[in-house]
């Protein structure tokens, strides 16, 4: 029997029962729960343990059906709050708290209420901030930290990142947004100026040849199409970035190259070949980053703009390099030559990879 919960303003207790490999759950009211326990003790069980805030109890049933009840008092624990069955998700940016850039970007109104049609964007922004929250210990509080966001687009997430790190968490951050669309850059700089975000700047340019900084603490790349993601990742490694957050898209390169006789029954179907190629591309990227001294994870990221769900590669610099041999064997077996592999090896040979 589990803990209390509130369903439609009625306090219920949940019981779980295992039948074979299935776990069945059922909710009971107080009276129904007592009847359920009595029935189970009479028919199926000989011992019942209960834990309470002040008293713990044990009910023992003999073979003849005699019940013995033992009680033990203990210090009162902190009161446990009854959980709502459908509890509200606790977001980092909370509904009801007006945030200037979310208002101007049409995600919420001036009272802080989320616009219904933009709720998916609100969830996406908060999910992204959760990824950042996990890596906060890697960001220094003793100096200014530099974050470069390539492919910032309309910059929902760039503004959210600045607001979260500087306004909510108190980090001294300098965030640089790069994009190839001039009109987007002008609008974002105008908004940053309006909000007084003095260390948030947007520039027209490509991360592959960006030389505006010599050292970057975190690189964010969202929806850099196809091999643009690889150039961004290679640049991040070159800078020795402590953290990399990347949401790739349009992974076409491997789809054009992949050949493997054993996998031909799968690869002959276009849609399966496309999906497999995308997954292989991101797995290889993560493995290559590990070979350059990063600990990597591939996580699910909500993204309504491109696909219902997407993947995010999160890499944290450890300095411990993994063996690249297994990756190279797989690349050879699949006849693929990823751009990131070439870029990282070129940088290694030039001696510029840290």
Walk through the language-model features, giving the residues of each.
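Short, small-residue-biased leader/transition segments that mark boundaries at the very start
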Residues: 1-7
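Class I S-adenosyl-L-methionine
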Residues: 8-31, 35, 65-67, 76, ...
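Conserved Class I S-adenosyl-L-methionine-dependent methyltransferase catalytic core
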Residues: 52-145
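Conserved class I S-adenosyl-L-methionine
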Residues: 143-153
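Phosphate-coordination loops involved in phosphoryl transfer and adenosine-cofactor binding
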Residues: 144, 172, 216
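Conserved SAM-binding loop of SAM-dependent methyltransferases across substrates and taxa
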Residues: 154-170
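Short helix-capping segments at alpha-helix termini
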Residues: 167-171, 194-197
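Conserved SAM-binding motif I beta-strand of class I
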Residues: 172-179
